[in-house]
Amino acid sequence: MRVVVVDLDGVDGADLALERAYERAAALDDGATPATTYARDVRAPGAADGFIGDGATAAMASRTCARAWTALRAGGTVIARGGDAARDAAVLAGFADVVVDATRGVVRGTKPAWARGTAFSLKSRAVRVVTADAGWGADADVDDELIDESALLTELDVNSTAVKYDDCDVGAGKKACKNCTCGRAEAEAAEESANAKSEETFVSACGNCALGDAFRCAGCPYLGQPAFKDTDAVGTKVELDLGDDL
């Protein structure tokens, strides 16, 4: 295991002096160390026992971590002494599992086994459709929606509620046509039969029917008619059609 150590304890805090001390870490200079040289424990420039001294700049820590990343193999570990600058630089460089040992004042990070920029296929996979069971209470042989046949409409219900269209000619009064199919002819025949049955025979009881309405009783069948000869009224049978308006 090769360890690179640069002592910055006796160096002035000026950026120029730190940069010169950094350059003395020849093993981590650009091009001086082949990539993935170290298996583990690359200690970047810093104090004799660690990473970057208290006077190191954030830019210097970032460059050092970047070169340490290049020098490490996949899975290698970097150990450095420092504070927030060392931790942030290690994270930004790509190290994973960066932890801080507050007791020793050391920052430790691991170079992941995967390579940055690794390609992988985004080919979509076939979606598997899983059909869930209906449940323990489901039975394919049971039909819960049976229809009660007694609740169905019968032919009589359909005929009674069917709309009847009036196809007879309309004149002064609606009468059934010759080839009536709407039912008006049957209705008129039934009405005439009812009127014939309701005809009653009346005989004048008061004998004043011929004198006019002033002498007629309230139930006289001649109400509203002019006076006539008495001989025509006596014993005359009058047929009253209850279907007429009196």
From Swiss-Prot:
Name the record gives this protein: Anamorsin homolog
Family under the similarity heading: Belongs to the anamorsin family.
Domain description: The C-terminal domain binds 2 Fe-S clusters but is otherwise mostly in an intrinsically disordered conformation.
Summary of subunit composition and partner proteins: Monomer.
Ranges where the record places region N-terminal SAM-like domain: 1-124
Species the sequence originates in: Ostreococcus tauri
PANTHER family the UniProt entry points to: ANAMORSIN (PTHR13273:SF14)
Region annotation (Fe-S binding site B) ranges: 206-220
Residues spanning the signal sequence: none
Region Fe-S binding site A, annotated ranges: 168-182
Binding residue positions for [2Fe-2S] cluster: 168, 177, 180, 182
Its biological purpose: Component of the cytosolic iron-sulfur (Fe-S) protein assembly (CIA) machinery. Required for the maturation of extramitochondrial Fe-S proteins. Part of an electron transfer chain functioning in an early step of cytosolic Fe-S biogenesis, facilitating the de novo assembly of a [4Fe-4S] cluster on the cytosolic Fe-S scaffold complex. Electrons are transferred from NADPH via a FAD- and FMN-containing diflavin oxidoreductase.
Motif placement: Cx2C motif 1: 206-209
An individual GO BP term: iron-sulfur cluster assembly
Short name of one Pfam family: CIAPIN1
Keyword Zinc tagged: no
A GO cellular component entry from the record: mitochondrial intermembrane space
Residue interval(s) of motif Cx2C motif 2: 217-220
Region (Linker): 125-158
InterPro entries to which the protein is assigned, alphabetical: Anamorsin (IPR007785), CIAPIN1 (IPR046408)
Molecular function in Gene Ontology: 2 iron, 2 sulfur cluster binding; 4 iron, 4 sulfur cluster binding; electron transfer activity; metal ion binding
